[in-house]
């Protein structure tokens, strides 16, 4: 098969591993910088060009689209879909999961466990917003943040008010969530391919930190997940319509709660924590499922 990997940087661990795994299994692979692709959006013969060349003959495309290039990255992916190339995850599923609010609303509609979450832009009654999610301590997030950036733990009401006011000054949208203290700065990342959890790791925040993102110095270790955690993670990925996803789950006293569904989960942390060859599993999934022109929108909303 001829596979395209949409990635800004061919040297990144995840991109390297996917290329390696595909080549080992006898496929032809090209890494394309998504921002350098340009498109002819025509109803007759839509095309994608890259460095002066018409990109044709691809059987599948693997999107590794960073949060900062979501808009253009998903547009390029949509163009690949238009010319009949099989996407590992569809453009609409990626945009759905990148919008934190939209994804939370969809998960809530499906009855999937979530932390109590308030959403606001310019609330007149900050006290009422804090009360709505069960009072301090609360976690306050910028809607557009990634990798733990723009996430603040406010330990008391006064701190929560100050942070919300500061964020409001930025003219941005704010998520206010209950703080699940029993997790003690840890979460579980489930790596989903298709309808299976192929690997899972526990991420632990460093001492004195509550954000467990590996980019923030968190550590990862192998973990056994419960059947309930497994089914929650799979349902969350399917609600987004993603074939490949990293679902972050908190172990609360009242069952698993989904924090986030990541459409471009990194491979380095999960492969080193679990010793599993996740990249090859991704390529095997493409081999089984890639047929030309087969994009259908899964999930609703």
From Swiss-Prot:
Source species taxonomy: Bacteria, Pseudomonadati, Pseudomonadota, Gammaproteobacteria, Chromatiales
Cofactors named for this entry: Mg(2+); Mn(2+)
GO biological process: protein modification process; SOS response; translation
The gene coding this protein: rimK
Protein name: Probable alpha-L-glutamate ligase
Entry keyword annotation includes Manganese: yes
InterPro entries for this protein: ATP-grasp, ATP-grasp_RimK-type, ATP_grasp_subdomain_1, RimK, Rimk_N, Rp_bS6_RimK/Lys_biosynth_LsyX
UniProt keyword terms in alphabetical order: ATP-binding, Ligase, Magnesium, Manganese, Metal-binding, Nucleotide-binding, Protein biosynthesis
EC number, UniProt record: 6.3.2.-
